[in-house]
Amino acid sequence: MQLEGQKIKKAILTALADPEMVRIINPTMYQSKSVCDIIMESKMPHTTAYRKIKWLVDQDLLVIDRICITDEGKKYSLFLSVFRSIVVKYENIKIMIEAEQNIDPVNRLTERFFSL
């Protein structure tokens, strides 16, 4: 699908230009991951990971796929990338971004919500 909004285009270009954000997006494209999993896989400092994940969620590039509760009663979120692939094309003065949605995480969340 062709993306038209300037806000989402700017967010995607910013995320792809930041190597740490790319290291967060890559493992969450195919499987939901917790912040701890992302930190372990990317060997990124905790504060950096939390800050970048918050930014990605605020920009709608990452969604909370699930909220889990441990046996001790602690909550943690599993994150999933909104896009499966992104193609950026710059021609003359126009930036065109095509993105393939990630198996529509919004529909999955809606289905889970109504199945409760």
What are these language model-derived features?
Residues 31, 55-59, 84-86, 103:
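Short, charged/polar surface micro-motifs in flexible loops or helix N-caps
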Residues 6-19, 34, 65-90:
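Short, cationic-aromatic polyanion-contact patches
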Residues 1-5:
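Linker/hinge segments immediately adjacent to helix-turn-helix/homeobox DNA-binding domains
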Residues 38, 49-59:
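Basic amphipathic alpha-helical segments that dock to polyanions
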Residues 84-116:
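Amphipathic alpha-helical dimerization/coiled-coil segments
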